């Protein structure tokens, strides 16, 4: 466990994506914390997928940072976790093709995310969704609210 002086220098980020229908109305949300300051961000898109919104949440959160940072980033998305920690370098090496030689889905977002992750020192943390993790619950609410707001706006 890092001591409090080390912990104060870490940007804590929680991200989540949501989709009402898949594909359908999507939203993303992120919560950033640093030295007692907190920033909540969200956005939406239609049509989209839950996986695109999960990726967009991480991209938008990292894009908020103005200089290289030490980050602890939590997500409930196995897709994001496995993509970044297990698959992305193989995809890149294979010209953005999967092991089955099929084009990587969401390669546009994976490429953006890869470029952003290279600017920071990131500790990736998977958390179980809808299991009472306060920051994940907040990110989930931001994402869900953004998707619902877009759905209501487009149906009005």
Curated annotation (Swiss-Prot):
Mg(2+) 2 binds at residues 16, 140. Transmembrane segments: none annotated. Binds 1 Mg(2+) ion per subunit. May bind a second metal ion at a regulatory site, or after substrate binding. GO terms for molecular function: magnesium ion binding; nucleic acid binding; RNA-DNA hybrid ribonuclease activity. Its cofactor is Mg(2+). Belongs to the RNase H family. This is Ribonuclease H.
């Amino acid at each position: 466990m890092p001591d409090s002086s080390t912990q104060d220098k870490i940007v804590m980020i929680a991200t989540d994506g949501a989709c009402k229908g898949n594909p359908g109305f999507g939203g993303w949300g992120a919560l950033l914390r640093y030295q007692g300051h907190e920033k909540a961000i969200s956005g939406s898109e239609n049509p989209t997928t839950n996986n695109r919104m999960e990726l967009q949440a991480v991209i938008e959160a990292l894009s908020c940072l103005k200089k290289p940072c030490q980050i602890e980033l939590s997500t409930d998305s196995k897709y994001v976790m496995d993509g970044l920690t297990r698959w992305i370098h193989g995809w890149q090496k294979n010209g953005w093709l999967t092991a089955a030689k099929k084009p990587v889905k969401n390669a546009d977002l994976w490429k953006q995310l890869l470029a952003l992750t290279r600017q920071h020192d990131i500790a990736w943390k998977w958390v179980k969704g809808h299991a009472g993790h306060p920051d994940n619950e907040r990110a989930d609410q931001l994402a869900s609210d953004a998707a619902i707001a877009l759905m209501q706006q487009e149906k009005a």
